[in-house]
Amino acid sequence: GEECDCGSPANPCCDAATCKLRPGAQCADGLCCDQCRFIKKGTVCRPARGDWNDDTCTGQSADCPRNGLYG
């Protein structure tokens, strides 16, 4: 299966020919991915909204999980 979106050859993290991450890359895109690496745990990826707390990166994924916590 695909590890990354190979539709854009400009993505430096993804090999457009194989749709696989390039050697050394942890991720190719996502709110918690920066320069092919997972953003460190606790970094705000989605600011608080209303009564909801900030959503933060896990350090293990490129996705920004919804923490579901009220402030």
Curated annotation (Swiss-Prot):
InterPro entries: Disintegrin_CS, Disintegrin_dom, Disintegrin_dom_sf
This protein's record includes keyword Disulfide bond: yes
Predominant cellular place of this UniProt entry's protein: secreted
Expression sites by tissue: Expressed by the venom gland.
Protein name stated in the entry: Disintegrin horridistatin-2
Record family assignment: Belongs to the venom metalloproteinase (M12B) family. P-II subfamily. P-IIa sub-subfamily.
UniProt cross-references to Gene3D superfamilies, sorted A to Z: Disintegrin domain
Pfam families from the UniProt entry: Disintegrin
Keywords, in A-Z order: Cell adhesion impairing toxin, Disulfide bond, Hemostasis impairing toxin, Platelet aggregation inhibiting toxin, Secreted, Toxin
GO molecular function annotation: toxin activity
The Disintegrin domain, residue ranges: 1-71
Subcellular location, record wording: Secreted
Disulfide bonds, paired cysteine numbers: C4-C19, C6-C14, C13-C36, C27-C33, C32-C57, C45-C64
Record GO cellular component, one term: plasma membrane
Span(s) of short sequence motif Cell attachment site: 49-51
Record's keyword annotation contains Secreted: yes
Note: The disintegrin belongs to the medium disintegrin subfamily.
Oligomer and partners: Monomer (disintegrin).
